[in-house]
C-alpha cells in the first residue's frame, strides 16, 4: 500500500499514478492546442506578452548562442530568441506534445522564422541532447505539468553549458491577500467558462486553475533549483506574484 502511495502524483487536485499523469496532461494540450494562443490573450488580457518580454530581457542571450525553449508550445519565446541569436545561433523548440509542436511549427513558418529553429518532441525529464550543449534554457508555463520536477531540473542542468542560464516562467503564489482572493475567484469561476465559450473545453481550464495551486511557490521552487545544483538562484515576482520568473546558473 505504501509503495502505491509513493508512486502517486497530482493532476490538478486529483491524485493519480505517476505513470498516468503524462497521458492526462497530453490530453489537455491535444484539446487546447488549436485555441492556445487566443486563450492566452483572453485569459491574461494580453499580459502574458509582457511576462515573456521580461523573460527575454533577463536571458542575457546573444548572437550565435544556442537556446532550448522547453515546453515551448506555440513558439512565442522561440520567435523572439530566433531573431536575437541570428543565423549563426540555434533555437530548439521542444515540447512533449506533438499537437502543440505542430501549431508552433506552422505559426513560426507563417512568420518567416526558418533556418535557425529546430523542433523536437521531448520529455523534460529525459532530454535527448548532449551534455553541456545549450547557453540558455527557458521553460514557460510548463514545469507545473511535469510529473517529476526534480528529475526535469536535473536533466536541464545536464544539457546546459557551464556559464549557462535556466529561466523558469511559471504561475506562482500571489503576494497579497486581496489579490489572492480575486485570483481564486477568477481562476475557478471565470477561466472554465471562458474555456467552454472559446475552446469548447471547460475541463482543461479547470485543470489549469488546479495545477497552478499545486505548483511549488516561489521559495520552494528556488530551493528545488538549488538542489539541482543551479547557483545564484533568484526570482522576480510579476503581477503581484501571480507569475514568477526564476533564474539560475550553471558554473
UniProtKB/Swiss-Prot annotation:
**Which top EC class is given?**
transferase
UniProt entry keywords in alphabetical sequence: Menaquinone biosynthesis, Methyltransferase, S-adenosyl-L-methionine, Transferase, Ubiquinone biosynthesis
What's its catalytic activity?
a 2-demethylmenaquinol + S-adenosyl-L-methionine = a menaquinol + S-adenosyl-L-homocysteine + H(+); a 2-methoxy-6-(all-trans-polyprenyl)benzene-1,4-diol + S-adenosyl-L-methionine = a 5-methoxy-2-methyl-3-(all-trans-polyprenyl)benzene-1,4-diol + S-adenosyl-L-homocysteine + H(+)
Could you say which residues bind S-adenosyl-L-methionine here? Answer: 74, 95, 123-124
Q: Which GO terms describe its biological process?
A: aerobic respiration; menaquinone biosynthetic process; methylation
Question: Which PANTHER family does the entry mention?
Answer: 2-METHOXY-6-POLYPRENYL-1,4-BENZOQUINOL METHYLASE, MITOCHONDRIAL, METHYLTRANSFERASE
- Record protein name field: Ubiquinone/menaquinone biosynthesis C-methyltransferase UbiE
Q: Which organism is it from?
A: Psychromonas ingrahamii (strain DSM 17664 / CCUG 51855 / 37)
- The primary gene name is ubiE
